[in-house]
Amino acid sequence: MIRFYANQAGYLPKGRKIAVLAQENRADEMEKMQDKQVSLWNEKGEQTAVKQAVYAGVDESAEDKVWHIDFSDLTEEGTVTFQDGEGAVLGSCIISSKAYHTLNQTLCKALYFQRCGMALEETFAGKFRRCTCHTGTAVRLEDYLERKENAKQYEVTGGWHDAGDYGRYTTAAATALAHMIYAQQFFPESFTENLNIPESNDAMPDVLSECLYELRWLLKMQMEDGSVCHKLTSMRHANFVMPCEDKRQMILFPASTMAAADFAAVMALASRVYRTWEPAFAAEVEDAAVRAWDWLMQHPQFIGFENPAGCNTGGYEDTSDLDERLWAAAELYVTTGNAAYLDKLEDYLKTNENPTDMGWVDVSGLAGLSCLFGAKKKEAKETQRFQVCQQKFRQAFLNEADKICDIADVSGYFVALTKEEYGWGSNMVVLNRAMILAVAHLLTGEARYQKMAQAQMDYILGVNATGYSYVTAVGTKSCQNPHNRVTVSDRIDETIPGFVVGGPNSAPIDEKAEWLITPDTPPMKCFLDVWECYSLNEITIYWNSPAIFVAAFLDKDA
C-alpha cells in the first residue's frame, strides 16, 4: 500500500515543499520502483499542476521505498489535494503564509499550560483550566533524609513543570529559556501575537512574559552562598493525579556546578534582554549571575549530580561542566564587558573542538550564539582575542551544519538522523540540529541550510514513516495521548495543544513499548501514541523550545 506524508501544519508559499510517498520494502509489496505521475488540485476543484513523484530509493531507517513530490513552485494559498494517475486521492496539505506563525503561537502557549504555583483560569486556559498547585514550602535534601525537626523552609513556588511529571530542574529550565529568549531576539516579528496569558497586553512580548514566569522561579533556586540547587522535586514521581492533588514534600536537591553555570549564563542573558522592560529585574539577575559565577570560581572541580537512593525523579546527570562554564563565561562577558570573563571564555573554548550543541547535556553552542550575535561590550584591546573566539564558533557551526546536511541528504525523509540515532528524545536531536542549520543560514545566507531546517520541521510535523505530527493537536494525525500527568488525569477528551513529544526510540525502556514494539521494527517506526510509553511519548519544555526557535526562523521569511 502506498502511503502519503506531508507537513500537517502547512507549507509556506515561498518555501520548500516536498511530500513523500512510501511503501514498505517487502517482497510482497511489488510496486514498481519508477517515477509516478501525480496531479495537484486546489480548493475549487481545479487542477493546478502535474508533478512527478521521483523514486528516491529505500530509506534504511524506515525500511521504506520512497518517492518525492516537489511542489515548491506552487505558491497559491489554500488546500492542495494530491491524486495518483488513476484519480485516487493520495492525501492533502495546506499552503499558508501563516503556517509557522500559527504553529509558533501554539508551541509557546503550551508553556503556559506547564505553569506551576498558580491557577490556570478559564479566561486563559479554556477547558484546560485547573486550580493552584504546589504552593507548599520545600526543604533541603539533607534535612529531609535526617527528618530534621524545624528544618528551614524555602519558598520556591512558580516556574514550569518540566515534563510529564511535576518536577522542576535547573539545567533543563536554563536551556529552554535560552532557546526561547534567543528566538525572540533573533526573530521578533514571529512573536507579535497575543498569547492570551495573564500578562498579555502589557508592553513586553508575551513570550518574554512567559519566560519571566520561569526566570522568577529559577532565581529561587540560588542559595545564599551563590550556589544553585540542581532540582526541585519530590522524592518520587507523583501518581497520575492533577497537579493540585500532588501533596508530596518538595525537596531542594544539592548544588551542582552544571546548575550554577547554566544559571549564571541564562541570568546574564536575561539581564541584557529584560533591561528594556524590567530594569530592576535585569539588575537583580545580573547580580545573581555574578554570584553564581563567583561560586563556580571557588569550586573549580566538577561537582556532578546523582539521585540519592530511593529517588526516581529526573537526574539530569552529566559527566563534565566545561560546556556549561563556557556558556556562562560567554554570556557574562557579552553582558558586562569584564575581561576576566574573556580569559575564562578562551580557556574553556580550548577544551571544546565542536562547540555547537544546544541541548541540556551540552550547551556549548549557546555560548556560540552569545558570542556571534550578542550585544558586545569590550575594550579595543580585547577585540582581536574575542574575534578569534567568534571565528572558532562560526567555523564549528558551519562544519556541523554541513555534516547535518550530509546525513539528511541520504535519508528518504530528509531527516538528519542516522539509523543508530533513534533514541529517547530523538525529536530533540532533530530540532537541535535544525537550530544549528538555522544558525548556519544566519551566518551565511546559504539557502541549503534553510531548506534543510525546513525539512527537519517537515519530519516533526508528519513527513515521517509513522505519519504522525509529533506536536499534540497540530495536524490531521497528531499525537493525542502524551505521557503527561495533566492530560491523563484531567478527564478531558482533547489533549492540550502544542507539546512536542519525544519521538521514535529503537531502544524503549518502558514496559508498554517493550511489549508492543517488536525487535525487528525499523527505528523510524518505533513509536506509539500511548500515554504509558514515556520513552516515546513524553513531553518536556526543552523539546518545545528548539521547535519554537526553528518555527520562528522559518516564519521570518514567510
Predicted segment positions?
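Zinc-dependent metallopeptidase catalytic helix centered on the HExxH motif
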Residues: D357-G359
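Hydrophobic, small-residue-rich alpha-helical packing segments that form membrane-like cores
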Residues: V290-D294, Q298-Q301
